[in-house]
Structure formats: C-alpha cells, structure tokens
From Swiss-Prot:
This is cGMP-specific 3',5'-cyclic phosphodiesterase. It comes from Drosophila virilis. Binds 2 divalent metal cations per subunit. Site 1 may preferentially bind zinc ions, while site 2 has a preference for magnesium and/or manganese ions. It is found in: Cell membrane. GO terms for biological process: cGMP metabolic process; signal transduction. It is a lipid-anchor. Residues 864-880 have a biased composition (Low complexity). The active site is at 496 (proton donor). Residues 21-173, 205-390 form the GAF domain. Residues 420-743 form the PDEase domain. Keywords: Cell membrane, cGMP, Hydrolase, Lipoprotein, Membrane, Metal-binding, Methylation, Prenylation, Repeat.
Length: 893
C-alpha cells in the first residue's frame, strides 16, 4: 500500500522526532528529504564558532538514499569541510537566512566546481535552505542536489515540502545537540571529579598530579599538545601557611578576550624569568616531559613568551592565528617552533590568593579549528584544578616541613624542659623529712619558710605517704626527675607559679588524709589527682583565658575553650613523654588510659567556667543526700569540686598568709590589666585595674561569697572532716569585710609591696613633725538629744550626724604620725594623755555612740564645725566623753 504525500510526510517526521544521536538524525533527514523531493543526494552543515567567527562544518556530505550511515559518517570525518559564513552557496544561506534555489549550478558564480572535478559528478540544480532553532538563530544548512524524476530543477512544491520538513528537523537537531552537550557535560564532570580526587591522592607528587591534569585536558579538548609553565614556587610559598586560616577569595570568572596592547608588558616582563618548571605533553605520549628551562630557553621560545605575557597580564588568550598575533605584538619574537602552530589557548593558573603560580597552554586542535568559548570554559576548570592541586601540594610540603620542625622543636624543648642530671642526683640523695615536719597534714600549711629544694622534698613525701611509689612501681629516680621537671616548667610569675602548685597539691593531700576523703578514691585516682594538682598551671603566663582570646594568641587559636587549662594538660603530657620522666611507665594500658583521663578532667576542672557548669549538678546530689560517689559521672563531679576547692584554698589559710597571697594575686592581675591598657587599649575589669586597687577587699568578699563559701559549705556538709577550710574562709571573710569598710571610709591599704598590716602603713619616724594636716571635728551633745526626748527635729544637722573626723592629707600618713595626731587631739580636748592604746581603742569600734548612760556628765557640744592646725596644743571646744570619742577617732584612723 502506497502512502500519499501527506502520510509520508508525517511518517518521516515521526521517524526523526525521537532521535537524539546527531549523526543518525542528520542521516535520516537527508534520506527522508530525498524521498520527499526526489533529490539525488544531499548534504547537511551545522553552524559552529563564536559570534564573531561563525562557520559551517559538513556533518554529512553527498548522502544518497542508498548511502549507509557508517559510510557517510566516516567520509565526513575523513574529509572535514569547513565553510565560513558568507562564502559559497551554503555560506550565503547561513549568513542571510534566505533559501537559494539554483536551476543551473555552473552558471552561478557562487558554485564551487572543485568537488565535481574530484568526483566526476555533475551538479545541475541546487536547493539550499537554512535550519533555524525556535529563537530564529541559524543552527545549520541543508542542501539537496539534482532531481531524479526527470525534472531539471526544484519547483515551488519541492521548496515548500523542504521548508516544512526542515522546520521539524530544526527542533530535532536542537534537541540532539542539547543531549550531546549534556553527555559531554556529564563526562566533563566525571573528569573533574577524578581530578578532585587526584588532588588529594597525589598531594605529595606534583609531577604526577600535573601530568594527570594535562592528560585529561588534552583528551577532552582534542588538542595536539599541552604545556604547563610553573612560576618559581619559592617566591609564592612565603605566605601559604600564614593564610591557611584566612577565608580564601573566590576565583573570578575569566572571559576569554583578545589581547590588543602590550604597553605595560615590558615593564612587567620581569615575570618572564620566574618560570622554573615546564611540563610538556604531546603526541601519543602518556608521560609528561618535565624540564627546568633556562633564561635563554625562555627568551628564545615564542610559546614561552606567550605564556609569560599571560602570566604578566593575568588574562586568558585565545589565539586563532599565531603568526598574525605575533605580528600584532612585536615585543614577542617569532621563532621557528610556531611554523606548525596555528591555534593557542593560554590561561593563567592562580592559587587561593589569586596569585599567578603558572600558565596552562593548549596548542592546535586536532580538527585544525580554533579553540571555542566552550573549549575555554572547560579549560578554565582544568586550570582551576591545576591551581588547587599545586597549591595543595605546596601546603602539604610545607606542612611536612613544619611537622619536621615541630619534632625538632619538641626534642629541644623536651631536653631543656627536663631537669638536669646533677639536680636529679642531688634530690635522690637528699633525705626526705616526715610529713609532720612540713606540716603536710594541716590545712594551715604554708610554703613561706620552705626553700625550693624543700618544696620538692615535700612533694616526694606526699607520694610516699600515699604509698604511690611502691603501689605503682614508680622508679624513684624517675619520680625525682619528674618533680624537678614540673618545677622547672613553671614560669616565675607572681602567683601562678610552682609554689602555688605545691599549695594546691598539699591541700589535696590534706583533704585526702586529714579530711578522710581518700576512702572515696581508688589509689589510681589519688595518683591522678596529685599529678593534676602539681601540673594544673604548668607554663602559666600570668594572664587568663579572656586575655588569650582578646589578643588572639596562638593558644587561643589552638584551644577555643578552657584555653590555658588545655595548654597546662598538654605541657603535663609533654613532660611525661620526655625521656626519663614517665612516672606512669609501669602501668598497664588500661590503667594508663584511666589515670590520664583523671588528670585531664581534673586539670580542665580548674577553669572556673567548668566549675559553674558542674556546680548545680553537684549541689543537687548533695541536697538529695548522696553518699555513694563511685559512679563515673558522680566521681568526676566530686573530683572537679575537690580540684576547685584546692585551687582556691589560699582563701582559707590563716590571715597572715591569706593577705600576703592576696597581694600576689592582685599584683599578677594588675600586670595583666597594664598589658590590656598597653596592647589592647582597653579598660580592664576592676580586679585587674591598678587604679582601683582599693576595691580589692570588697572584691575579695564577693569572690568568697560567690565561689568559695558555697563550695566549702556543701563539701563540709558531706565531708565534715574538711570543716577547717570552711571556717578559715569565714574568718578571712570577716577580715576582708573589715578592710572593705575601712576603705569606704577613705583609708587605702595596698600601696606597698606587702600588706602585713590591714591598714595602710607609711614610712615615718617617731620624731617627724606633724604638719600640713587639716581636720574637722564635730561633736554631738548626747544629753541634749535625750532632753529632747529623742526627737532630733530641733537638733542641728552637724549634731544629729554624731561625732565625725575628716582629715585632708597633703602627704602620706604613717602609723607614728597618726599616733602623734591622736595624742595631740586628745590633749587638746582635756589636757591629758589617752589611757588606752591605739590597738585597744580599735577594739571599741562596735561601741554604741548613742549610749544613754554615759560614764561622765554630759558636756556642751563644740558648736559649729571648727578648723584647727595639727600643731595646735589647745582647744576651746571644752571637754567631751573621752572613751566614746577615742573609740570613734581610732576607728576612723
């Protein structure tokens, strides 16, 4: 059954509608067009090139209805025909988008008879028609030749059938091209993924990495040769490691463009001599040729000069004709190597900081065509991966160097951090006194009277008394060396030094022994706690975690939380790992992991931030009557609270010890405050501000109330044998509160290197003359108040306020000065010397100044405020109640 023309037309449309293989589709189109128009043969050209350089490429040529697909494709690829837009019949159709119907080909000047001469075929009629996409852009040209039904030319009916069929074919061709592009994109992505994997697999071998990238690029882009020039790496690596933590800049999308000028080239040509490595991959070779070109080699190579041009300008160069480009850029010399070179695609390779570290170069497409924008886009991805790979390799190499340097530094540090053999031998030979000699069992222990060697002996005694040396088979020489090494690794800061570590360890020892808390601990935990106490402030710099963060110190970058505590633990591990210092060497692996976990947790617990996190959970356990502390979490809580209790135990020492330690703490804090003002230009908090030193008593009271008392109170509730810590803290709170009240009355007390006395003492002698001191005395007539029945509505303001003393100092007041001043004042009041010493009178501060039963008759008040010189020996004020007045004055003084 024969199909009519309409049915055949629809059948042929269905034949091509779902075809996505571009070769098969084009073959079907030409065969079907031959059936519809009775054409002898046909050709199909596809549009290629850039907007400024478009041309037609013969996809299939001279296809008849009997030509097999394979033969047609093979012939087209073997004899690739390229027709620029505007040249020849097909070129004119592509340029004008207009159909051309030629009845006699040889009479048309646009016809090229060379093919007829080669094949012996005679072309008579030609019908050439454009193929457009849905946007109206040319995507191809179809051409049919000679009618087979006896007609000499294509008529209007043929033209209409041809046009209608090609309309549908245009849609099919565009779909097939899109499918082909998606397949290519998929393949490209697979290659890029493989390259990404290679970057990390080959990070220790730059040559293998670059060779693999070049091989993939050459195969994907179908070019003859591929080269990579690398800039002198020594000039680029100086800032790699410093910028590792910086956010890398995004690489900007680079569009290919023609480089027209070279005005700045010569000024920047110093870059030319920086190429030190050249990778070349050409022909069928799978291995790159790696060389180190000399300056002479670079200067006599046109390809190298073009690469230097790209490295200088930082722009991609897509050269269609090398000879023309070289003539336009006369600063580049043409050498013989470019005789066989036609097209070049050259692109800079940059690192994360957008610094040019090399140039990638593609030479000659296998098809003989110029490189397209699509080629440039794909090649850019290879250049980016090449840059990442080179950068990553450099970083890896530098990291390896840094690791080697770190090992050397650790070896040196370990050597210098370890105690000397002479010191160790001496400590081994020294006799170790009993624990009672050092007062180790007491919560009132102080190290003030111990020399440095005694502090080490005291530590050894604590280990012996806890039976740790024999229990865990610690070699005595190793223990001695470890103790000396720990002492050596404390810096000579004012408070957080070796002596502070000794005091913390002794408090832990006293809590375990005197406080009977050892019954709740295993021997391994006792070992870990004592080691943690001795190491909990190793290498302390006299500054806190907040200071490390503010200054962005390396420690703050290394440890984001509990900065110093993590550093202390790392220093502890470093000492233990040093030769001859591992006191845990005889432990089993399981015991070693357990004791190290205890040490780490205990040291980190000395961060008050950790204390505040754990405190509520501990308080809840105690309030619920917990008595079993053997669970892992509960034991960790208990050890953490014990570490904090030991760390702040100076607050529970006798007053003569506590206020000396407080002065050391204050001095260290003030030093940090000075650094914050100097380095950060910020105002430090009150406790670190030297200008607010008089507020220290008040801040000590706050510290006791917020941290110390709640902690010691809850520990004493559960473990009553450590009550001395709580009681000592209470007593010191009363002393600090007393000082705080005196400071509020205008007395300073911390102007000296030591604060042996709670009230400020100034240099002075008994013979110094009291002068330049003005004071004001206001006296209240107590009887007058009682006569008014307690109603003070008629009492003058200065009488209602009671007795007051105001001293204006123009110089420093010493104790002797104040004593003479008080004597002068008393003598001016009643002409007699005070019968009570200053120390005794200070105990009367709490006496009621408004006592209704005075021991002496009421006296008239002095009247209004009177101003006297300190050198005055008499007063017109009359007599007053001596005992009350003396108590008040001495309290104020």
């Amino acid at each position: 059954m024969e199909l009519d023309e309409g049915e055949l037309f629809m059948e042929l449309i269905r034949d091509v509608a779902n075809e996505l293989d571009i070769d098969v589709l084009c073959h079907k189109i030409l065969v079907n067009v031959g059936l519809l128009t009775h054409a002898d043969r046909g050709s199909l050209f596809l549009a290629k090139g850039t907007p400024n350089n478009k041309y037609l490429v013969a996809k299939l040529f001279d296809v008849t209805q009997k030509t097999a697909l394979k033969d047609a494709v093979t012939r087209a690829r073997a004899e690739e025909i390229i027709i620029p837009f505007g040249i020849g019949i097909a070129g004119m159709v592509a340029q004008t988008k207009e159909m051309i119907n030629i009845k006699e080909a040889y009479m048309d000047a646009r016809f090229n008879c060379e093919i007829d001469l080669k094949t012996g075929y005679k072309t008579n009629a030609i019908l050439c028609m454009p193929i457009c996409n849905y946007e109206g852009d040319i995507i191809g040209v179809a051409q049919i030749i000679n009618k087979t039904n006896g007609c000499m030319e294509f008529d209007e009916h043929d033209v209409e059938i041809f046009r209608r069929y090609l309309t549908f074919c245009g849609i099919g061709i565009q779909n097939a091209q899109l499918f082909e592009m998606s397949v290519q994109e998929y393949r490209r992505n697979q290659i890029l993924l493989n390259l990404a994997r290679s970057i990390f697999e080959e990070q220790n071998n730059l040559e293998c990495l670059v060779t693999k990238i070049m091989t993939e690029a050459r195969e994907l882009l179908k070019c003859e040769r591929c080269s990579v020039f690398l800039v002198d790496l020594d000039c680029c690596e100086e800032s790699h490691l410093e910028k590792i933590i910086e956010k890398p800049h995004q690489l900007e999308q680079r569009a290919t463009r023609a480089i027209k000028g070279g005005d700045s080239f010569e000024e920047k040509q110093k870059m030319r001599n920086r190429f030190t490595v050249l990778f070349e991959l050409g022909g069928e070779s799978q291995a790159a040729n790696v060389s180190r070109p000399s300056i002479n080699d670079l200067s006599h190579s046109t390809l190298a000069q073009i690469a230097q041009f790209v490295a200088t300008t930082g722009q991609t160069v897509n050269i269609c004709d090398v000879h023309d480009w070289v003539r336009e850029h006369n600063q580049i010399r043409a050498e013989g190597e470019i005789d066989s070179t036609h097209a070049i695609l050259c692109m800079p390779i940059v690192n994360a900081q957008k610094t040019v570290i090399g140039v990638a170069q593609l030479i000659n497409k296998a098809s003989g065509l110029p490189f397209t924008e699509s080629d440039a886009s794909i090649f850019e991805a290879f250049a980016i991966f090449c840059g990442l790979g080179i950068h990553n390799t450099q970083m890896y190499e530098n990291a390896c160097k840094l690791m080697a340097k770190q090992k050397v530094a650790l070896e040196c540090l370990s050597y210098h951090a370890t105690a000397g053999q002479d010191q160790t031998e001496k400590l081994i030979q020294d006799p170790i006194a009993e624990a009672e000699t050092y007062n180790l069992y007491s919560f009132t222990f102080t190290d003030f009277d111990l020399v440095d060697d005694d502090t080490c002996r005291a530590v050894l005694r604590m280990f012996m008394q806890c039976n740790l040396v024999s229990q865990f088979h610690i070699p005595y020489d190793v223990l001695c060396r470890w103790v000396l090494s720990v002492r050596k690794n404390y810096r000579p800061v004012k408070y957080h030094n070796w002596r502070h570590a000794l005091n913390v360890a002794q408090t832990m020892f006293a809590m375990l022994k005197t406080g009977k808390m050892e019954r709740f601990m295993t021997d391994l935990e006792i070992l870990g706690l004592l080691v943690a106490c001795l190491c909990h402030d190793l290498d302390h710099r006299g500054t806190n975690n907040a200071f490390q963060t503010k200054t962005e110190s390396p420690l703050a970058i290394l440890y984001t939380t509990s900065t110093m505590e993590h550093h202390h633990f790392d220093q502890c591990v470093m000492i233990l790992n040093s030769e001859g210092n591992n006191i845990f060497q005889a432990l089993s692996p399981e015991d070693y992991r357990s004791v190290m976990k205890t040490v780490e947790s205990a040291i980190l617990s000395t961060d008050l931030a950790m204390y505040f996190k754990k405190r509520n959970a501990f308080l809840e356990l105690v309030e619920n009557g917990e008595f079993d502390w053997q669970g892992e979490e509960k034991k960790d809580l208990l050890c953490g609270m014990m570490m904090t209790a030991c760390d702040v135990s100076a607050i529970a020492k006798p007053w003569e010890v506590q206020h000396r330690v407080a002065k050391l703490v204050a001095d260290e804090f003030f030093d940090q405050g000075d650094l914050e003002k100097l380095q950060l230009n910020t105002q430090p908090v009150a406790m670190m501000d030297r200008e607010r030193k008089d507020e220290l008593p008040k801040m000590q009271v706050g510290f006791i109330d917020v941290i110390c008392l709640p902690l010691y109170r809850v520990l004493c509730d559960t473990f009553p044998w450590i009550t001395p810590l709580y009681e000592g803290t209470l007593e010191n709170r009363r002393n600090w509160q007393d000082l705080a009240e005196k400071v509020e009355m205008g007395l300073t007390w911390i102007d000296h290197d030591t604060i042996d006395k709670p009230v400020e003492e100034f240099a002075g002698c008994a013979d110094e003359e009291i002068k330049d001191i003005e004071f004001t005395v206001t006296t209240l007539n107590c009887n007058q108040q009682s006569q008014h029945g307690g109603d003070d509505s008629h009492t003058p303001e200065h009488q209602r306020s009671g007795s007051r003393l105001s001293i204006k100092k123009t110089g420093a007041l010493g104790k002797v000065v104040r004593s003479k001043l008080s004597k002068t004042l008393y003598n001016s009041m009643d002409g007699s010397k005070p019968k009570t010493s200053l120390k005794l009178l200070e105990s009367h501060v709490s006496e009621d100044m408004d006592d209704k039963s005075p021991t002496s008759p009421s006296q008239p008040h002095l009247g209004s405020v009177g101003r006297m010189s300190a050198s005055s020996s008499t007063s017109s004020a009359g007599t007053v109640d001596k005992s009350k007045k003396r108590s008040k004055l001495c309290a104020l003084l």
